Each structure stands twice: as C-alpha cells, then as structure tokens.
C-alpha cells in the first residue's frame, strides 16, 4: 500500500511515495532521503541532498560569470543541489564569490580536492577557492576537511641564496609531508634568500617552526634562520595600508589629533635651518632674523607635543643693514601661511606679538577661498590673527618684496565619477581633508573612479582598515534616486 503525499524542498511542492513497509523508493529515482523518493519523469523535480551535505564557499570567480556559466564547471563532480552567486543587495553587483551545495557529501569533497587553489579562472590573478563555508566549519565534521592553507604554510627567511628548492625540501621534509616549496626570486631570477613551504597539516608546520626557527645560520646569511607561519592575505593588505598611513603620520593612533601640529613643526624647523644658513652668508646676524629663528624653534618644539606656543617678544627693534640681502631665504608652501589662522593676544608689555610665519617673508593670502585651506586651518581655529609685519616694517620690508602675491584661487566644483564608481566613506577623522583622502586612496585611482573594477578593488582593500580607534567603512555610493547617499 502506498500513501500519496507532498514533500517540500526549498519551498516547492513535489509528489513522492512513501512505502508503509519502511523506507522504499521506486527504481530509477534521482535520489532519496529519509524514505522520500522522486519521480524521474517529472520535470519540476527538486533534487534532494544528504543530511550531512557540505555547503561550499567559492571564491576568486570572474564577476561576469553567473550561475549558468559556473554550473558546467562544478557539475562534473556530482549533482548540484544549490548554486548561488553573491551580489550586493544595494547595487546588485557581482561580488566575485558564490555558495555551492551538492546533493551528496562526497561530491563536495571531490570538488574541493580537485579545484581548491588548483585552477585559475580566466581574468583572475589568483586560483579559485573552494572550501567549506564558515557555517560549515563550525560544525562537527571539520576533521574530514583539509586545514586552511595559512595554518600550514611557512615563511622561511635568511636562507643561503645559492640554495635550491630541493635543498630547502631536504631541510624541512623530516617534519612531515611537503605539498609546496617555492623560493622567492627577483626579476633577474636570483634567489631573494627566502621561501614558502606548505605542509599537509598544521601540526607538521608547527613542529618545523619549533625545531628550525633560530637553530642555525646559513652560509652567507646575516642572521639565524627564520621560520614562521606565512601572513594571510588580509594581514599583508593591512600591513601595506599601515605603511602607507605611517608615511602620512597616522601610524600611531595618538598621532592623528596632532598630525597637523607635527607637520607644522617639521616645516618650521626646516625653514629655520634655511634662514640661519642664509643670514650666515652675510657675516652679520640680523636681530629680527635671530628672534624669528628662535621663535620658530620654540614653536616647533612645543607643537611636536600638540601644544600651542606663546611667541617670544623682542626687546628691541632693528633694521636690516644695507649689506644683508634676503632673496636667499626660501619660502614655505601654504601649510605655513596664515591661511585664516587666528591667534594670540597682545603681549603684557604692550608690544604686539611677533609673527614667526612672517619671518619667512610670507604674507597671508586674502583672496584664497576658505574651502581651499588645508587641515592646519582647523587645527589652529582658536588662535587670533598675528599682528604681522606691520609692527616691524623695517625688518620685513625687503623680504616681503621678494615674494609676489599668488593669484586668487578659484573654487572648483566637486566632480563625481559615473554611476557605480563613487565611494562613500564613514568614520574619517575630523582632521582629514581632501589631501589626506587623496593620499589614502591614491593607489586605487581616486575616491571617484572611472570604472567599477577600480572601485571594487578599493572597497576590498580599504573597507575595515583601522585608523586610530575606528575602522573605515567603504562601500559604493547609492544611486542618485535613493533617499540617502549611503
């Protein structure tokens, strides 16, 4: 006796037969699970999967391939239960990865063994990734899967540059089965003195580290052998970003609030040296030049700690002797110009505060647009305007004439790239301006790109990058018809 019933698979109904004498299925059925059989003649039959089937994550796939293009690649390992390409929920753009579930567990293991890091798809720089999804790795079947590559891949440094791959293999094969051994070489083909060694298990890699790290010094090497786990791709990307941030004075989180002060102090010290060298050529030290140099030194020292320095006040005025000329004094770009800095009140003795910036012969740019001011303007927003050279016309007159006034800057209208190429960035420090933003995203083209591929590359590298106590959030700007730009 057979009872007609409906079963659900992925939310769709399908007719099945259940035998009353146990678990039965009709001959030639496509598959069975818990006694449910499917009629092969029904074109709408939903395939069934094993109860212990593995959900695979597929990475490094071209963004122009969808499910129907990927299906032939994976079908050779078994019947596919579900294949889904991941897309951005706002833009619908391909993320370059997918989830795959086979009907049978063995098919997933075969596909992982045959494809993971073994084949590079057209248009990609790295081999395809086929591994259990995160949800699967937390299950109880992890013992049947291969350990992640980063848990068993070693970096070996301080090798003899004359050693070959075979020499390195002989050194490491005593600790386990070696799957890969690659010596890093330069464009000329010569060894760089380092290599990557991949074992078949994490325990073997750990044993090699314990036995060989620092154990000997190879001939021609400057220090003992280095054996450690290789960095992951994410760690390498983060290190590159931190190096780039360090060049901009942002490596230390505490340096961010005072980055503008540090740049100001550094430029002051550089100009102090140039000023002193210039006046030294004349054999006579102008009292005002000496005062300006000392004042710059004081401000630079205090500003290195993020503090605003009170300028020293000269005890007497002075004029420049006829034999002293000023054209040799170089100028400092706009970060040292007044640019809207406001500043210190008059001194107690009644004399106005001398201006360190004008010791360099640079006038404020009255025609400059406030929007074009650099981030230093925000850093010194609470300081009153200096009295400037009006207090000491004789001291500053010759230097001021040596530098013509720059033409007024015309504000430029903000430009945007085409649709799908504009990024919106959260959690930027308040001290950041256009210049800092440009430096951070310069390796990727710019914040507004001219093609979606560059925008996606920037998102992958910079999303989650930590600056100070916050992490950047980088995503595509929403379409213009959306309610919000982010």
UniProtKB/Swiss-Prot annotation:
> From what superkingdom does this record's organism come?
Eukaryota
Q: Which GO terms describe its cellular component?
A: cytoplasm; nucleoplasm; nucleus; postsynapse; ribonucleoprotein complex
Subcellular location(s) of the protein? Nucleus; Cytoplasm
Q: What is a single molecular function from GO for this protein?
A: BRE binding
Q: Which species does the entry assign this protein to? A: Homo sapiens (Human)
Task: Enumerate the residue ranges of region (Disordered).
Answer: 18-39, 121-149
Key words of the record: Activator, Cytoplasm, mRNA processing, mRNA splicing, Nucleus, Repeat, RNA-binding
Gene name per UniProt: CELF4
- In its UniProt record, which GO terms are filed under biological process? alternative mRNA splicing, via spliceosome; embryo development ending in birth or egg hatching; excitatory postsynaptic potential; germ cell development; in utero embryonic development; mRNA splice site recognition; negative regulation of excitatory postsynaptic potential; negative regulation of mRNA splicing, via spliceosome
Q: What does this protein do?
A: RNA-binding protein implicated in the regulation of pre-mRNA alternative splicing. Mediates exon inclusion and/or exclusion in pre-mRNA that are subject to tissue-specific and developmentally regulated alternative splicing. Specifically activates exon 5 inclusion of cardiac isoforms of TNNT2 during heart remodeling at the juvenile to adult transition. Promotes exclusion of both the smooth muscle (SM) and non-muscle (NM) exons in actinin pre-mRNAs. Activates the splicing of MAPT/Tau exon 10.
Q: So which tissues is this one expressed in?
A: Ubiquitous. Strongly expressed in the cerebellum, hippocampus, amygdala, temporal and frontal cortex and frontal lobes.
Please give the PROSITE patterns that the UniProt record associates with this protein: RRM
- SMART domains per UniProt: RRM
Task: Describe the location of the RRM domain by residue ranges.
Answer: 54-135, 152-232, 404-479
| Residue ranges of the region described as Sufficient for RNA-binding and MSE-dependent splicing activity | 1-298
The keyword Cytoplasm is annotated on this UniProt entry = yes
The UniProt similarity line reads:
Belongs to the CELF/BRUNOL family.
Residue ranges of region Necessary for TNNT2 exon 5 inclusion?
Answer: 239-258
Q: Where is the composition biased (Polar residues)?
A: 18-28, 138-149
* Protein's recorded name: CUGBP Elav-like family member 4
Q: Is Cytoplasm tagged as a keyword?
A: yes
